[in-house]
A protein has these predicted regions:
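Function-determining surface determinants
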Residues: 1-247
Length: 247
């Protein structure tokens, strides 16, 4: 059971509870009592549980000692299945078991340097709900209203807009890709403009300006390579780390 938390640039910070499952439906009484509003509510939820989608994947995991921290690296491969179709799972997850969050970003940066990976902004659950027809489809999002927001809040919104449209570009048809690219560039612009107005410009700002230009000038094949390139992924990680560690 994953509870509500905070997501910043691909870093999910939230309480999570695990229990063995012997069939298709979980036994909610196997989870801690304190996570429920009441046991009566828990039992009512149990009686109404219906499977909406399934995730079927093989997980390999390793415990890594890195920069004074213990980090679990999990590699999941499989698929998500819902009434609207299937989607591939092929992802790496890093979970901080002990130590400082800075180590988590450090290890992620090492993985990004290898190339061929990107930060995923959509969880398995979000993708599953879409395949079940219960979630909002991926679509172009307008530039949010930023009136009254401080610089860090604007950078957070800009990064979310950028990553949302990056995912859309990778999944949508050719006719929507230009709109998705414009959404990415709007997100980048929002991040850059907010960063420029801070009292002290972040160290990642020059790299962002370079990536903005490359994204704007890239053809379709070049853009796909850029989105999985070490430089762009490392930049997103640097922004996410700045938001998380400096907040």
């Amino acid at each position: 059971i994953k509870c509500r938390g905070q997501v910043v640039g691909g870093l999910h910070a939230r309480p999570e509870y695990n229990a063995p499952v012997s069939g298709d439906l979980p036994t909610l009484s196997a989870f801690p009592d304190h996570i429920w509003p009441s046991l009566a509510v828990r039992d009512e939820i149990q009686s109404r549980l219906v499977a909406q989608f399934s995730t079927d994947f093989l997980r390999r995991h390793w415990l890594i000692a890195f920069d004074g921290a213990q980090i679990e690296l999990a590699w999941d491969r499989g698929e998500i299945v819902g009434v609207l179709g299937r989607a591939e799972i092929d992802e790496l997850e890093l979970e901080l078991k002990s130590g400082e969050a800075s180590a988590l970003f450090g290890l992620a940066a090492h993985l990004a340097d290898l190339g061929g990976v990107r930060l995923g902004s959509q969880s398995k659950a979000q993708r599953g709900y879409r395949l079940a027809g219960l979630g909002k489809p991926l679509a172009v999002q307008p530039l949010p209203d930023i009136g009254g927001l401080d610089g860090k809040a604007c950078i957070t919104l800009g990064l979310q807009l950028w990553q949302h449209h990056e995912q859309l570009w990778l999944e949508c048809g050719k006719e929507e890709r230009q709109q998705a690219l414009q959404g990415m560039l709007q997100g980048c612009d929002l991040v850059a403009e907010a960063a420029e107005n801070l009292a002290q410009a972040p160290a990642w700002l020059p790299a962002l300006r370079v990536q903005q230009r490359l994204l704007a000038e890239a053809g379709e094949e070049q853009l796909s390579a850029l989105l999985h390139g070490a430089d762009l992924v490392g930049l997103q990680l640097a922004i996410a780390a700045w938001l998380h560690l400096d907040s």
